[in-house]
């Protein structure tokens, strides 16, 4: 299976949301990384066939998804940032309702609802109302509904926003587990969501694709540019004024700074191996990282 994004652009009035995006996807997890407003959601909505591009096209095995229409949508599982749910429905009833909308027979729906509830570890909560679920449970029901039609292409937009670390890890592991024979597109501004599971990472900024590579290859441009340094309290503000300081950790009466700099920021600075948090700051240091 091959999914191709061919020179896709999208504008809203005079504002350009995406500019000339070209990509190719096969099975595996692809992380789409960018700050808020970078064009991630617009890109995901176009690939999910929820929104039409202003120019360019998306192809599945060489065929335009606009021409495939419902045949393409049958292959899609989509989890948007906000999933509309009926709060008085139980988890089981909600999933059965969505299964009916997706055209599953009653027998098929019952079997599939049981399967996805088990997959997202919510079988014991099947009779509980979704309106009383925690944020993590709500996101898991969201991914469950996206999987009801056994999609070949799974598109999830900012799935872990607002979740605690335990739920984020659970969700990340679930996506990794189901990606063996699917294309999984995961958009996020939380680096740790994709660092361990992404086959490739796409970096979007201002609606443009600025990098696309494996996590290891993405880090090469900042090798030798990440430093750690112990300073006293007055040194913290001094180095923050001059350099990109990614992290500050207190160690007894001193502070350890993690600095991104083309040159050695201080004779005592020690070179460190870069990670994707460093990469994010390298590209989005002017953005607010949530």
Regions found by a protein language model. Give the residues of each.
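Catalytic Walker B motif of ABC-type/P-loop ATPase nucleotide-binding domains
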Residues: 154-158
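Conserved ABC ATPase "signature" region
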Residues: 96, 100, 107-125
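Helix-to-loop junction immediately C-terminal to a conserved catalytic motif
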Residues: 48
């Amino acid at each position: 299976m091959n999914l191709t994004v061919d020179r896709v652009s999208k504008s809203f009035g005079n504002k350009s949301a995406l500019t000339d995006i070209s990509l190719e996807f096969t099975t595996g997890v692809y992380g789409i990384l960018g700050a808020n407003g970078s064009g991630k959601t617009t890109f995901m909505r176009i690939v999910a066939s929820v929104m039409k591009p202003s120019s360019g096209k998306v192809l599945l095995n060489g065929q335009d998804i606009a021409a495939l229409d419902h045949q393409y949508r049958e292959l899609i599982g989509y989890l948007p940032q906000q999933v509309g749910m009926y709060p008085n429905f139980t988890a089981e009833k909600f999933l059965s309702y969505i299964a009916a909308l997706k055209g599953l027979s009653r027998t098929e729906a019952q079997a599939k609802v049981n399967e996805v509830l088990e997959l997202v570890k919510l079988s014991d909560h099947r009779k509980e109302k979704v309106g009383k679920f925690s944020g993590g449970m709500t996101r898991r029901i969201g991914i469950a509904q996206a999987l009801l039609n056994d999609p070949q292409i799974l598109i999830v937009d900012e799935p872990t926003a607002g979740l605690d670390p335990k739920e984020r890890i659970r969700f990340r592991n679930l996506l990794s587990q189901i990606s063996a024979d699917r294309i999984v597109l995961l958009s996020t501004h939380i680096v740790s969501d994709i660092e361990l599971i992404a086959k490739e990472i796409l970096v979007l900024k201002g609606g443009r694709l600025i990098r696309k590579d494996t996590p290891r290859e993405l880090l090469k441009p900042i090798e030798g540019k990440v430093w750690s340094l112990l300073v006293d309290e007055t040194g913290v503000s001094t180095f923050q004024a001059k350099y990109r300081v990614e992290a500050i950790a207190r160690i007894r009466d001193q502070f350890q700074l993690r600095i991104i700099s083309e040159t050695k920021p201080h004779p005592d600075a020690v070179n460190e191996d870069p990670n994707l948090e460093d990469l994010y700051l390298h590209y989005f240091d002017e953005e607010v990282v949530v």
